[in-house]
């Protein structure tokens, strides 16, 4: 025989660990058999005379409601038969069946009784399933009813989805009988939303008047209350005068006449618009339609340019609009009060502190805006709480940490707290009431640091840094995340992208763009994220690409007329055709 190898280590006891996958299922099945045979049952649930036998321990394990009932000092904890009122007996039986079987069928015939019962018993999983079922049933003819049902039962997620569906499909919803039957409070909740998806404000006015005329006798008293949420200053002059101003119901109400006069003044006095801003002058932000993208200035063919062009996603066309009076590369661009501001930049010879303002209704630039206190190029510009902020940049001598803000009512710039870090080529974004300054360069090397400004405290604080150093990057807020794309690190132009979650204070990567892009513009247009122009390390770019968050992919979607590096981008509502031809003051009465 050969040698037998014997270990010097002491023998360890033999072990075999086992977790049964069948055990929970088999146990529940047997418990349900006991219930069906009324064996070992220690409680009877009486609902509208129907008696349902069960075991306290099973009900308590599944339902916080029953657990509180049976383990506390309530009288029911000592009763063998418990009566529960204000709940459907069929729904109760289905829910107790679920406690024993893990199975339930939700359908049109039971969802309206099942959801309230699940809410009472605090069966969160069933609440979620019922809400998911109702989400799938949403259509323009029933979304208002589902919304009211969700509101009644405090189903916040279903209420949010129903609201979003109603806003997005408003043009079909306004034709439904449910819409005509709305109580005035719910009507106001809907039409006051910035997210209402309409081709023009005329549709909102027509919807309100259809609702009113469905029951004039009772609803006439609410006309002014409702019409104050129609954004009449955004109506075309022709519709305002010919339809709204001539309506007998409107003319017979003093408060309604005041609303019409307010809108006329807004249309007739464009120079006064900064002083007339309010909820009725704020354009709505409908999904997937109505917005256009402006590409402003930049660097092309070895020189700064003044050209400006406009992209309409519905036609996928780029069209030239009026150029600025000055060439501007490294220009900061933002939209405030329906006007496009171009701040600072470099004209190819000198650094600029001048500002121009574009009115899409007249297709004209004006230069009557007060200049910034410092010359700035590669500056970040954004709007927060009705003020225009200019952040960082360089003045030809040094990289800046200066921040100032513009008050359109006073036509005046004032300094606020400086950033903790000097930043040129910085990207800025506004989210949750804060102004974020992202990346850039301190004059020596690219940065991955991020800080945010709280206007309530006039203070900057650091937040989590990006995973990549980036200067001359693109930045935008999309679906409550801050997206940072492209730019340049220490070595090369970048195609990589990442996004910031303010709730977790963390950055996470997303898929890279199809091209490397430094000096890229980033903007959200009609619910889609566009990256515009830039420099790939070899050539200036005129291509644009769009990001799809569902597929996590970028795709090319056309070209500008001009190649642009360091141009600014801004998004505005598409101007109505009628408003391109300005009208004489005496034609609006």
From Swiss-Prot:
Annotated keywords: Actin-binding, Kelch repeat, Repeat, Ubl conjugation pathway
Region ranges (Disordered): 1-22
All copies of domain BTB, residue ranges: 41-108
Pathway membership: Protein modification; protein ubiquitination
One GO biological process term: protein ubiquitination
Domain BACK: 143-245
Residues annotated as signal peptide: none
Annotated Kelch repeat ranges: 292-338, 340-386, 387-433, 435-480, 482-527, 528-574
Molecular function GO labels: actin binding
Function: Probable substrate-specific adapter of an E3 ubiquitin-protein ligase complex which mediates the ubiquitination and subsequent proteasomal degradation of target proteins. May have a role in synapse differentiation and growth.
Protein name as annotated: Kelch-like protein diablo
Gene: dbo
